[in-house]
Amino acid sequence: MGLQFILGDATTDHAGTMATMVQANLQADSQNQIFYLVPNHIKFEAEVDLLKRLRAQAASVNGVYAQNRVQVLSFSRLAWYFLKNTALYQQPRLDRASNTMLVAKILGESKEELTIYAGEAHNTGFVTQLADQLSELVTGRITAEDLNTTVAALTPGDRHRAKLRDLGIILDHYEAEIGPYATNASLLSGLQQVMRNQDLSHTFIYLNDFNVFSASETGLVETMIETAAEVTVSLVLNKPYPAAPPVAPNLFLPAGRLYHRLYQKAKTMKVPIRLDRFAKPRPLSEGMNHLADWWQTSTNLQPQAPAQTAQNKEVELAVATDPYHELRTVARQIYQAVRQGARYRDFLILARRLDPYAAVIPAIFEEFNIPQFTDLERPMKDHPLVVLIESLFAIQDHDYQYQDVMRLLHTELLLPENMDIAAFRDALDTTDNHLVRTGITGKKRWTQTDPWRYFQRNPNADDSQLDPEADKTAQINAIKTLVADTVPQLLRQWQTAKTGREAAASLYQWLQTTGVIDQLNVWRQTANADGDLSRSQANEQAWDTFTQLLNDYATILGEADFNRDQFRELLAAGFASATYTQIPSTLDSVVISETGLVRLAKAKHVYVIGATNTAMPDVPNDSGVLNSEERQLLAAQLPDDRFLPEQGPTTTLGDPFINYLGFMAASEKLTLSYPMQNTQENSENQASPYFRQLAQALQLTPATWAPAGLGTSLKAVLGSPRAMLSDFVRAAGEAQHQKLPLSRSWQGVLASLKQTKLAPLAQKLAGSLTYQNNPGRLDPTLAVQLYGRDMNVSVSRLETYYRNQFEYFLKYGLLLQPRPEFELSPADTGSLFHAVLDQYLTQLRDAGQTLADVTAADVAAAVPPLVAAITKRPGYEILGSTHRMAYLTSRLSRLLIQVLTNMRQQQRRTGFRPMRTELQFGQIGDTRGLPGLSWPLPHGGRVNVRGKIDRLDVYRESDAQRFMVVDYKSTQHRFDDSDAYYGIALQMLTYVEAMANVPADPPFVPAGALYFHLQDPKFKFSTDLDLDIDRLKAFKYLGFLVAKDGADLAAVDKTISAETGGRSMMVPLGFKKDGAFNYNQSNILTPEDLSAYLLHNQALIIDAASRILAGDIALAPFQYGQESTVISNSDYQSIMLFDPATGFDHYNHVPKLKRKEVLGRVTTDPTQIPHHRQEDSQA
């Protein structure tokens, strides 16, 4: 037995020296057996490297080399090697996920004994953290008794007592529970026992690339030193520390402490300690050697003479604008180097923390077509299998809530039979829309035997598009059947399960019978076929983790009474700590890692990115279950062979060593960079002290890594075709912004890209630089195909066209509609109001009555049954969905009663009576009403206008039927002459014309057009409050009346007249004392004025139809002054992307006109159409 140290700083070749010693031992005795131990994550690389070196020393002629006496292993694989046939190794393995599950169980069962951790069993984040802490304690050889001893040594009032006491209780239970399992600590302990009892006199053990050991690993190494023929430990250390450990500041602090511990232990065991050997220097560039000197002198606070700049060309510093362009520049430089003969494996990219770069790594390296391996653990908690299992529990907890069911289905692991994935996705989208629109939720609705029916909620009878109801009904019922036939079955089995084993078995069988396991296999096979090993293994590892958790659950709680909540929490805790094991997809790839992970020093060029002052040195993390102060309390009570890793501020002492190893992993060149912008926190970064000191000591001027721009040379940004396309777009955009010509070289880039397979994308992106948000015009032939040669339109559609032509095209040409949602909108309440008012007034008319004939009590009794009947119709489900909605329905009933009661009061003051409600003119859908309005168009075809008048009030005279059009509105409306002139308020004039054209005897003569506000008015209390009068005023009709003189309006409000004067409380009418109209109180049009308005209205309708069929779809929203409501209130903002600030988008800005101005224009030439902006470009 004996102990040999191989020392040397990071400029030396430790692996080469070790290989020479291995070769010598192999040749010395044919019985000698070699175990070469390295950290697990570099085992494969180390094995390849060692065998290459041994082959070189053996001078194998044909290049083939095999060796069966050399084993390159990690500690875990060494345990397998010696223990694989023992009972200990056959025990179930307690991996991180299973360990977390076990700790969750312990927390739940021991909460009555605990103080501060009693309520943490449901906190999966804490459970994961606690599980790691317990594992660390066991690996550190620390027992519950050690914790109790520490607690006993504390004063009664010490703030750490409760925490350490709880941890001691939990650790005591944990030690008992892990007995049947093989843990890392138990395997290392078992390995120690085996090694003590075996003849290792011909066994030579080499340990390389270790700088620190856990207590369990230290015990194993000490046993090796005591029992093996010889143990050789290689340490990155500039000198030995036999008598005392190194003292900070010292660059080699971690390795020096390990040397001292092993040296003293060997000395105590009276094991011979060989003379230290020093590794030979490895080939390094001059700059890298100079960098190594700087590390030692700067860390040890020694003065250093400034170096010549020429010596330092192999060390580069750079400052990037942000993390994305920092990493992109690195990728570009690697791409250029490989084009000149380098290999991808020559490069290593390191960061202290990769988090700021994790999201962009795949995209950047794919853009440059560079194979890469990111050595970073990825959590498994978002895998579709995990999401599916979580969703099953959530569905049971929340009674088939929309979010939970859709989350389950969107995993795409549960599929209907005989439905391909494209059809499933389409059906799922339809179902998603249906659920959002109808608010369907709950097990009862999902499992009902009656099929669902797809329909347009509150169907718009004005919509003439084809109804896809049958196809979509089939789709939503396919999804409904899938859920109803699968999910309830499992949930019932969980409800009836007696033991944990029954519940676990039912979940596994359900996954099997529903095809989830088959779908996972399909995913794996597809990934393999695509050559995506990482994706393939992710699916396999997720399934393996799940089955391991299920087995562990069955082992731990299989015979116990089944507790569903506990089952869920244990699975969640297990998955929360599970990660994917990754392997490189190719041997020749760029490795991306963190400086905290040991790597073999085989790269030629190392890039260290993210060198900010918060990452280098790293900000110490002291947020574990046991913080640094508590670890020190514990350490004071422990013997030397029991300890925990350092945490908190003390770890900063070893930070220089970690970064030193990373920097010195390169043999030829180091590039150190940092981004100025912290994109995660939207703040500015500062350079690392290492960066600043290195710049000063080596006289380096940092380069600037900025995005490619107009002045960037092509040589500097040479990259893959896809990367060059990105750079071209940026440079061309900069040229356009600065109004400068694009250089011929950049123009040549675009020309070259157009000769590659990227030509379509290059053409599209280049076109985006000159893009203006101008939809142009539709070809008239296409417009006719969209709308028909004879246009059948409603007034509201034409108003939309005059407000925004492009929105009309989106809404009625492309038939784009916003996604309907399950909510009570103004349109819903408006539809209900219209339906109730129509039915009640129709009932009265059929009975030969009017509102003036009934009492307020009659109204109050009639409305609630009507509301109840109408809300049972399809489309009104929301009003019965919740107690709150039921309350709102009752409020709507009271509001309708108030509205009708007030109408009753109004009709007692007027001679006009409702003749019809919901009076249709023209054809709407399959129904026809009164004759519609129809005019020929200048270039052929006709425009046919349809509509529905909410209420038509009529007063019969001997020679005429004077009528008033009444339109119900949920907000207050007035007749605006300017709006009518510009075409954004065509409704009232069109309705008046439609009725005036109806043949009748005596003829219909317009008396007015009025808006009625459906509202629930509020009144301020006062002593002189008269509710009847105030309600009349609140419900006052607004609009216009038609008359030559006061006699024409005598029947409108019988409480006033031209003779008596006064002001109406129900219509916009007032008289002066002399009998003339008081125009401050009235809105009166003469018959001649009305005729001019109607002629202009007709011209607007014909003009709009002509423009629509001509393909005019300008994006020029109507605007008065500075208002922007046409855009801000539009459902299509995200499509239009209208932004006047660009200088390309413009409003159709018009002046607001008064009645006098409007009358002046329409009486001069009623057919004159106001100017509308229309872009000249063609679509």
UniProtKB/Swiss-Prot annotation:
Heterodimer of AddA and RexB. Belongs to the helicase family. AddB/RexB type 2 subfamily. InterPro entries: ADDB_N, DNA_helicase_suRexB, P-loop_NTPase, PDDEXK-like_dom_sf, PDDEXK_AddAB-type. It is an enzyme of class 3 (hydrolase). Pfam families: ADDB_N, PDDEXK_1. Despite having helicase-like domains, this subunit does not have helicase activity. One of its GO terms (biological process) is double-strand break repair via homologous recombination. The heterodimer acts as both an ATP-dependent DNA helicase and an ATP-dependent, dual-direction single-stranded exonuclease. Recognizes the chi site generating a DNA molecule suitable for the initiation of homologous recombination. This subunit has 5' -> 3' nuclease activity but not helicase activity. Gene3D superfamilies: 3.90.320.10, P-loop containing nucleotide triphosphate hydrolases. Signal peptide: none annotated. Its cofactor is Mg(2+). Keywords: ATP-binding, DNA damage, DNA repair, DNA-binding, Exonuclease, Helicase, Hydrolase, Nuclease, Nucleotide-binding. GO terms for molecular function: 5'-3' exonuclease activity; ATP binding; double-stranded DNA binding; helicase activity; hydrolase activity, acting on acid anhydrides. This is ATP-dependent helicase/deoxyribonuclease subunit B. Its EC number is 3.1.-.-.
